[in-house]
Structure formats: structure tokens, C-alpha cells
């Protein structure tokens, strides 16, 4: 039988540690650069807007100032683009670290599930061994029933060979009872074959298999009782046959002696005449 399993609660997943790959925190200089970049974006937008509006007038009035403003605009735009590129990589790195932490938690949960699955597989192997042992016991019991059935077949052959003598010696009621017992025994033995297939189909359900085994034990006990009754009846019939044969032989010997005695008495009388 299977031993009761202890359900172990899985430990809480470890908190993701970033000792080796710690996310760099933005420093004061980075914050200042970020504020400066935002301010420069506002300034560049304003300058660009003014440059677009006063491009024609400015180029005609003061082309040198327009060129300086355009160079400033291009330089600020390039610096902001470079800063945004670095900041985007930093955000991607932080998102990647968060995904790595979630993957570590998932990996831990998968390891816990793997341990639970291994425990369940061991329990299933133990249950399979128990079921195989029960199946072997059932098959040995069925083999015993088949051997008993073969013995009853040979006994029936002997009864068929001596049918005429049994009809003369015994009443029809005893023979009818014997035939009914043998027929019921055959029906119960035939019932065992589909029951064996049912046991194979119910091998995955231990409770129903236990109930079927209990039913088989009940049938086995009833079969043993009937076998005992049949063996007792066979012994009774054998003793009666032997007694009847002895009485018949005694009767035959008496008849022979009776028949031989007149002949002996008749032979001296013939000699005297």
C-alpha cells in the first residue's frame, strides 16, 4: 500500500539580488545634464522657431548672426541626440535587469514544480508496484481456479463414464443437484475472465481495485465452499459405490453358492441310483 505523502510548502522565491550586476543609479551630474538637455531642447525649439520665421529677413540683414545661430542649433541638436541615445541604452539595461529578475523567479518556481513532479513520480512508481503485486496475486488465484476447473472436468469425465451405473444406484435428485452445482461452478468460472479484464482497466483506481479484490475474495471463498461440498459429495458417492459394489459382489457370491449347492446335492443321488 502507498504511504501517505507529506505536502511540503515551497519556500518563498529568493529576492532578486543585483550584487554582481547592480543597476547604476543616476548621479547628481547626470541629473544636471538631464535638466540642461530639457532646457536646451526648449531653447532649441524656440531658436528654431525664430530661425524659421526670421530666416529670410535675418539672412538679408545679418547673414553672420544667422550662420552662428544655425551652427548653435545643429550643435545642440547633435548633443541632445547623443544624450538621448545614451539614456535610451540605460533604460533598456534597467528593463533587461527587471526581466532577468522575473526570469529568475520563474526559474525558481519551475525547480519547485520539478521537485514536486519527481516526488509524484516516485509515489506513482510505488503505487504501480503495489498494483502489480495485487495483479500477480489475482492471476495466481485465477490459475488455481483453472486447475480446480480441470480437476472438475476430469471428475465429470469419470462421472460420464459411469453414468449408467450411477443411474441404477442413485436417485435422479442427487444427480440433478450435482449437475446444478457443476453448472453454477462453470458460470462463476466464466465470470472470472471478464472480471480480470475489468481489473486491468481499473488498475489506475486503487479504491475500486481494492473493492474488486474483496469481491474476488468473496467469490473465491464461495468457490472453496462449493469445492468442499463437491469433494464431500464425491467422497460420499465413492463410498456408496464401493459399498454397493461390495454388496453386489456378496450377493453374487451368495447366488453362486446357492446355485452350486443343489448341484452338489444332486450328484450323490445320481450315484446311488
UniProtKB/Swiss-Prot annotation:
Coiled-coil zones: 206-233
Top-rank taxon, per record: Bacteria
Topology within the bilayer: Multi-pass membrane protein
Induction: Detected 12 hours post-infection of host HeLa cells.
Residues annotated as signal peptide: none
Subcellular location: Secreted; Host vacuole, Host pathogen-containing vacuole, Host pathogen-containing vacuole membrane
Major subcellular site: secreted
Record's keyword annotation contains Transmembrane helix: yes
Protein keywords: Coiled coil, Host membrane, Membrane, Secreted, Transmembrane, Transmembrane helix
Gene3D superfamilies xrefs: 1.10.287.1490
Region Disordered, residue ranges: 1-20, 253-273
Transmembrane regions listed in the UniProt entry: 41-61, 64-84
Example of a GO cellular component annotation carried by this entry: extracellular region
Family recorded in the similarity comment: Belongs to the IncA family.
SUBUNIT field: May form homodimers via its C-terminus. Forms homodimers, and probably higher-order oligomers.
Domain notes: IncA proteins share the same general organization: a short N-terminal domain, a large bilobed hydrophobic domain, and a C-terminal cytoplasmic domain.
Described purpose of this protein according to its UniProt entry: Chlamydia replicate within a host intracellular vacuole, termed an inclusion, which is formed by fusion of many smaller inclusion bodies. IncA may be involved in the homotypic fusion of inclusions; injection of anti-IncA antibodies prevents homotypic fusion, but not fusion with exocytic vesicles.
Record protein name field: Inclusion membrane protein A
Amino acid at each position: 500500500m502507498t504511504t501517505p505523502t507529506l505536502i511540503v510548502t515551497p519556500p518563498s522565491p529568493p529576492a532578486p539580488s543585483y550584487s554582481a550586476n547592480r543597476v547604476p543609479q543616476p548621479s547628481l551630474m547626470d541629473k544636471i545634464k538631464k535638466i540642461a538637455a530639457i532646457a536646451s531642447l526648449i531653447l532649441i525649439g524656440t531658436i528654431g522657431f525664430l530661425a524659421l520665421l526670421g530666416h529670410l529677413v535675418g539672412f538679408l540683414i545679418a547673414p553672420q548672426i544667422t550662420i552662428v545661430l544655425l551652427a548653435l542649433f545643429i550643435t545642440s541638436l547633435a548633443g541632445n541626440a547623443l544624450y538621448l541615445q545614451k539614456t535610451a541604452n540605460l533604460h533598456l539595461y534597467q528593463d533587461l535587469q527587471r526581466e532577468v529578475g522575473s526570469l529568475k523567479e520563474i526559474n525558481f518556481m519551475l525547480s519547485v514544480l520539478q521537485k514536486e513532479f519527481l516526488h509524484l513520480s516516485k509515489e506513482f512508481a510505488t503505487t504501480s508496484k503495489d498494483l502489480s503485486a495485487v495483479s500477480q496475486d489475482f492471476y495466481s488465484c485465477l490459475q488455481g481456479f483453472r486447475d480446480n476447473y480441470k480437476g472438475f472436468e476430469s471428475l465429470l469425465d469419470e462421472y460420464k463414464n459411469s453414468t449408467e451405473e450411477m443411474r441404477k444406484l442413485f436417485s435422479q435428485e442427487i444427480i440433478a443437484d450435482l449437475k446444478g452445482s457443476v453448472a453454477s461452478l462453470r458460470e462463476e468460472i466464466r465470470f472470472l475472465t471478464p472480471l480480470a479484464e475489468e481489473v486491468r482497466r481499473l488498475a489506475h483506481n486503487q479504491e475500486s481495485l481494492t473493492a474488486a479484490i474483496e469481491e474476488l475474495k468473496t467469490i473465491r471463498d464461495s468457490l472453496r465452499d462449493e469445492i468442499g461440498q463437491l469433494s464431500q459429495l464425491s467422497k460420499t458417492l465413492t463410498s456408496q459405490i464401493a459399498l454397493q459394489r461390495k454388496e453386489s459382489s456378496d450377493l453374487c457370491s451368495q447366488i453362486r453358492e446357492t446355485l452350486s449347492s443343489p448341484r452338489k446335492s444332486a450328484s450323490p443321488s445320481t450315484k446311488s441310483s
